[in-house]
């Protein structure tokens, strides 16, 4: 099973948009992607999730991020389900869904629990534009995902990469420091001195030398 920091395994998959090679299909376009699995088509919780992902698709695309679903179903099942969602709920699913009918990719990614039958759990893999796995989340089959948290996670990772900072709990609505971001702790005596000086000048704020934070530039 892959872990955070590893490259996403190279694999060609069947989808509702045709064959796709992962992660190259997105990496070559310079895009991040969120791969998420669902237990089965034509199930209530999964339907609410797909509608929710589609409603937030523009938010993901503004973050240069694509969506791709997966379940252990055949492609015709995906196509019929997507058709049903459009006809009954007036929501058109625009992103591809992987038809992992043999469960090979799901098995490789650790999406199948031996205690939950042959269907996937609700896994989420966030992969950056270099094809590196940046985050992995697992939800049980009986609980739908918090989709706003997945948007927040992608945004936080991208800001962290760009600015070299860390994000506090519930960023940008942290209980202690609000929408400010955390400066990585000093790793030398000289850095501690520099942090204290920067704090005295009002350039940053510190609760102590190891807990400093600032507004985003």
From Swiss-Prot:
Boundaries of every Thioredoxin domain copy: 2-159
Coiled coil: none
Organism: Methanocaldococcus jannaschii (strain ATCC 43067 / DSM 2661 / JAL-1 / JCM 10045 / NBRC 100440)
Keyword match Zinc-finger: no
EC number: 1.11.1.24
Record's keyword annotation contains Disulfide bond: yes
The protein's name in its UniProt record: Peroxiredoxin
Predominant localisation class: cytoplasm
Subcellular location per the Swiss-Prot or TrEMBL entry: Cytoplasm
Stored InterPro entries: AhpC/TSA, Peroxiredoxin, Peroxiredoxin_AhpC-typ, Peroxiredoxin_C, Peroxiredoxin_TDXH, PRX_1cys, Thioredoxin-like_sf, Thioredoxin_domain
């Amino acid at each position: 099973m892959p872990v955070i920091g590893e490259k996403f395994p190279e694999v060609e998959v069947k989808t509702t948009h045709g064959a796709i090679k992962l992660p190259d299909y997105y990496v070559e376009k310079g895009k991040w992607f969120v791969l998420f699995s669902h237990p089965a088509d034509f199930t209530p919780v999964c339907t609410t999730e797909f509608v929710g992902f589609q409603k937030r698709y523009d938010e993901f695309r503004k973050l240069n991020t694509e969506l791709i679903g997966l379940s252990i179903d055949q492609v015709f099942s995906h196509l019929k389900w997507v058709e049903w969602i459009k006809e009954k709920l007036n929501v058109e699913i625009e992103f591809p869904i992987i038809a992992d009918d043999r469960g090979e990719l799901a098995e490789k990614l650790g999406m199948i629990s031996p205690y939950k039958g042959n269907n996937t759990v609700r896994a989420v893999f966030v992969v950056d534009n270099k094809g590196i796995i940046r985050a992995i989340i697992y939800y049980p089959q009986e609980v739908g995902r918090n989709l706003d948290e997945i948007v927040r996670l992608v945004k936080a990772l991208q800001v962290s990469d760009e600015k070299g900072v860390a994000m506090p709990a519930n960023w940008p609505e942290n209980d202690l420091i609000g929408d400010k971001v955390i400066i990585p702790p000093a790793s030398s005596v000289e850095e501690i001195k520099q942090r204290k000086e920067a704090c005295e000048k009002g350039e940053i704020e510190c609760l102590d030398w190891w807990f400093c934070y600032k507004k985003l530039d």
